[in-house]
Amino acid sequence: MTLTFLGASHGIPESHRRCSCTMVTIGERIYFVDMGVMAICDLTDRGLPVEAVKGIFITHMHGDHTNGLIHFADLISWYYTASDPEIFLPLLEGKEIIDSWIALSCHATRDLRYKQVADGSVFDDGFLKVNAVRTQHTKSSFSYRLEAEGKAVLFTGDLRRPDADFPKGLAKDADLIICEGAHFPATEYKPFLEEASPGRVIVNHYAPWNIPHIMELSKALPDLHITMATDGMEVEL
């Protein structure tokens, strides 16, 4: 399982930092957690077929996590028509908005496979298993645990605060925990990461003001190999 951070910025893009989008590659199959960038452009740059995308998992509906999804849905509706991923939305009303936007361009919309996210098991295609737990960042926001090839990765997604909604159950025995770093000092993760004791921690979606807190957290928990995600960074599990 290979993770590629296509965008690792917080709520707004910065120089050489785009909004949230992580590509997960398992063999020749591709999945995305959030799509705050025009991911088809990245696939094209890498010579990867759009048809290889099998699943898209949105943590919540804020634009910095979804703005690339309309572009993706538009292009697979009329051009990359062999692409048929399952698209998991925290709010299924988003489907109607995407379809309406595509219709404004006079392109016909396909019956894409949108799915409503709920607590528990949401996806299993025999290659990747995904479980979800609701968080308190918005009225409908989720953390995801991805399992493939004997490895487990937790994406916290955006949280209210760790003491309110850190997904302890999904963190158990995780090889990698990917934490957000935009809404509270990263040092607040300390007791929860100590308890989970993952093999590695990557702080993603972080704001500049939080970098000193991330560095402090890294010094406090050296065995967890805490690092910060950067655009284009690849991690092999």
Model regions and ranges:
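Conserved beta-strand hairpin/beta-sheet module of binuclear metal-dependent hydrolase folds
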Residues: 1-46, 140-160, 176
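Active-site metal-binding loops of divalent metal-dependent hydrolases
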Residues: 8-10, 36-38, 61, 135-137, ...
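Short active-site oxyanion
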Residues: 28-31, 83-86, 152-153, 199-201
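Active-site metal-binding motif and surrounding structural segment of the metallo-beta-lactamase
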Residues: 38-88, 172-175
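Structural motif
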Residues: 57, 153-155, 178, 202
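Metallo-beta-lactamase
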Residues: 82-140, 148, 226-234
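Short internal beta-strands
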Residues: 85-92, 178, 202-205
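Binuclear metal-ion centers of metallo-dependent hydrolases, dominated by the metallo-beta-lactamase
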Residues: 163-176, 185-237
